[in-house]
């Protein structure tokens, strides 16, 4: 399903060149078609899905044929695809067109419903839910009054502790006394990557301070008050966040292969310097710096000994690792990953044992 006849779109049995921006309408129409097909997988829904009876009315009596006309697709072809999806094994792979297009959150939500009603999650030949080394963030409960929300749009950090970027221009341009006045952008280009780029351009032009660390002078960087050049991914220690290697498990820490220009730092080193100047890092004793030059066991013991007596140590631990171990390794990111490995939960050890690590 792609508006463009891309290289992958030239291969398959079915290519649906959906009209750009109508993905959500197409998915809703497909769900409405499938719930009317006798082959809908109730045997899967009953033991695995909660709240289905509340969800079904959203898709009943929907004019799927008219929707396909808006999507500029052949209804019979979509109908045939839906029939196949209820009778065959299949899996789906959404990518940037879904994630960065219109109604991206709705797209992702309805794709999960589409997969659920066809029973493709966690089954042979369907979609797997891969594991992780550590979560990149934690979902917030918007019902908890202690959950901090954006001041202008009242949005919670629902997705892995992150706020939806689409609300950012409004948060900057509002007259609220606690509105966003300064932004630090790291390795992304909001003025071109996030929804409503015109609103972003207006909002970022009103900021009192815009700082960008990146490997390129992007549109956002050109608007910034300060640009802090980063090392490229060939010049720094980095990890692979999206390995397509299932069922084999890989977590790759890649070593730098190119010498960076003088004074050019990793993004993690830049954040450590900023945190230090802001006074967020407690004073670190000299013997901890010395221990970082020794073996990891010596360093780890000294680190825990100091952390037990320093109240602010645990909260600032990534920066402490960066200033000590990261100084020796010339990589705050690599030092941070060492800390993650040392504090890995039991589930991590269990999974590591499954693939051969003692």
Identify the role of each PLM range.
Residues 1-123, 128, 132, 153-356:
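Cofactor-pocket helix-loop regions in the catalytic cores of large enzyme subunits
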Residues 135-140, 221:
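Short, conserved secondary-structure transition motifs
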Residues 15, 143-146:
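Surface-exposed loop and adjacent secondary-structure segments within mature catalytic domains
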């Amino acid at each position: 399903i792609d508006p463009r006849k891309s290289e992958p779109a030239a291969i398959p049995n079915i290519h649906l060149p959906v009209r750009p921006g109508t993905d959500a309408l197409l998915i809703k129409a497909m769900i409405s078609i499938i719930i009317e097909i006798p082959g809908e997988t109730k045997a899967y829904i009953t033991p695995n899905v909660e709240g289905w009876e509340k969800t079904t009315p959203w898709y009943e009596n929907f004019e799927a044929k008219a929707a396909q006309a808006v999507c500029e697709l052949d209804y019979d072809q979509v109908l045939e695809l839906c029939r196949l999806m209820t009778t065959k094994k299949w899996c789906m792979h959404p990518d940037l067109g879904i994630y960065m297009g219109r109604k991206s959150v709705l797209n992702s939500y309805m794709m999960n419903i589409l997969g659920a009603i066809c029973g493709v999650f966690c089954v042979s030949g369907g979609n797997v839910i891969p594991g992780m080394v550590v979560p990149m963030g934690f979902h917030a409960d918007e019902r908890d009054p202690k959950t901090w929300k954006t001041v202008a749009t009242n949005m919670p950090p629902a997705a892995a502790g992150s706020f939806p970027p689409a609300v950012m221009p409004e948060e900057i341009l509002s007259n609220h006394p606690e509105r966003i006045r300064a932004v630090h952008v790291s390795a992304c280009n909001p003025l071109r990557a996030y929804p409503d780029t015109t609103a972003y351009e207006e909002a970022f032009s009103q900021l009192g301070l815009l700082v960008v660390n990146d490997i390129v002078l992007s549109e956002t960087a050109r608007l910034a008050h300060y640009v802090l050049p980063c090392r490229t991914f060939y010049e720094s220690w980095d990890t692979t966040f999206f390995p397509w290697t299932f069922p084999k498990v890989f977590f790759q820490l890649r070593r730098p292969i190119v010498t960076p220009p003088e004074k050019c730092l990793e993004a993690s080193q830049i954040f450590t310097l900023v945190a230090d100047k802001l006074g967020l890092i407690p004073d670190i004793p000299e013997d901890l710096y010395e221990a970082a030059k020794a073996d990891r066991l010596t360093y780890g013991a000294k680190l825990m000994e100091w952390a037990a007596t320093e109240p602010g140590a645990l909260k600032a631990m990534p920066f402490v690792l960066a200033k000590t171990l990261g100084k020796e390794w010339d990589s705050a990111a690599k030092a941070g990953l060492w800390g993650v490995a040392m504090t890995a939960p039991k589930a991590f050890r269990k999974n590591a044992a499954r693939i051969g690590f003692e």
